Design a protein with these regions (language model features):
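Alpha-helical transmembrane segments in inner-membrane proteins
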Residues: 1-335
Length: 335
């Protein structure tokens, strides 16, 4: 009971810190906005005050995108690590990032797509098709879905799709590469409220599915045979979990580009704080990953003002060394 209360207080503290980070995201940037003006802009927009327009039309949408995409990547990473029982698993193992990138570059190079909405549709389509292909390739006729087969299928498909993407980029006109790299770098600039519609619904459905599977994932952590003895339908659990990962990682990749590291490290930090229970790991992963991506976006705006560094690049630059320190300080078995 005491541990549950501590976890609940930890979630509450994390939510409060995330709210403060979101407020900082609205106020900070190439042109800082005073906190009082930021709060006024959230309550009622003054169309004659350009600071209100900066907060409401530019920073609020990208803050929401960072929160949604980060939470989705964190939960997707926790699901992947629970399913494969591999501490290095992350959403990219399903080929979702590679599938989304290939679909976007095909759309830009062959169909001259230019708007963020069009990128969004292509990325989500490519991510979904890649995830379905990996799930089908990971099936074993005798035992159903196999974690090792799934990881190998995802790694192989990712390499193949990345190669195709590279071929198209190298042979495309320079303007095609310029349009593609903005999305591929994981930049959140240019996000608008219009882009949050159906990706937000997909993330909501994925989160609901993931949280509903938490108890089954706890049973599977004991081994497939014990899980089956406890009444867990392994094939159905795998199917629903993979569907949740595809929805979460696909929508996040479509919104923010192929963000690496966030979905890998957030579940490890969540386990350090919450223990091995997936009912707590999943919400902690959502909060931590949302904070990591939002923090990377804020830092990218401050370090390179008046321009900015894409959040995906900042996450890679800071995340790699931080994860190495984390692994060296704590035994891998504890992670």
């Amino acid at each position: 009971m005491r541990r549950r209360r501590l976890r609940a207080w930890g979630l509450l503290a994390g939510a409060l810190l995330l709210a403060l980070a979101a407020l900082a995201s609205l106020a900070l940037g190439s042109r800082p906005v005073p906190l009082a003006v930021t709060l006024d802009a959230l309550q009622a927009v003054d169309p004659h005050d350009d600071r209100h327009l900066v907060v409401r039309e530019l920073r609020l949408p990208r803050t929401l995108v960072a929160l949604l995409a980060g939470a989705a990547l964190g939960v997707a990473g926790a699901l992947m690590q629970a399913l494969t029982r591999n501490p290095l698993a992350e959403p990219g193992l399903l080929g979702i990032n590679a599938g989304a990138a290939l679909a976007v570059i095909v759309g830009v190079a062959l169909f001259d797509l230019a708007s963020m909405g069009q990128y969004l549709g292509c990325a989500f389509l490519g991510a979904g098709l890649a995830g379905i292909a990996v799930f089908l390739l990971g099936q074993a006729r005798e035992t159903g879905t196999n974690p090792v087969r799934l990881v190998l299928a995802g790694a192989g498909l990712s390499v193949m799709l990345a190669s195709l993407t590279g071929i198209i980029v190298l042979n495309a006109p320079p303007e095609v590469f310029d349009r593609f790299r903005h999305w591929a770098a994981g930049s959140l600039s240019g996000s608008g409220f219009a882009l949050l519609g159906w990706p937000g619904l997909a993330i909501g459905a994925g989160l609901a599915t993931a949280f509903a599977l938490a108890a089954r994932l706890n049973a599977l952590a004991l081994g497939q045979e014990i899980g089956r003895a406890l009444g867990v339908d392994l094939r159905l659990t795998w199917l629903l979990a993979c569907l949740a990962v595809m929805l979460l990682a696909g929508a996040a990749t479509a919104l923010a580009g192929p963000i690496a590291f966030v979905g890998l490290v957030a579940p490890h930090l969540a386990r350090l704080l919450a223990g091995p229970d997936q009912r707590w790991i999943l919400p902690f992963s959502a909060l931590i990953a949302a904070g990591l991506l939002l923090g990377a976006d804020i830092l990218g705006r401050l370090l390179a003002a008046p321009t900015e560094i894409a959040a995906g690049i900042v996450a890679l630059l800071l995340g790699g060394p931080a994860f190495i320190v984390l692994v060296r300080r704590f035994r891998l078995s504890r992670l």
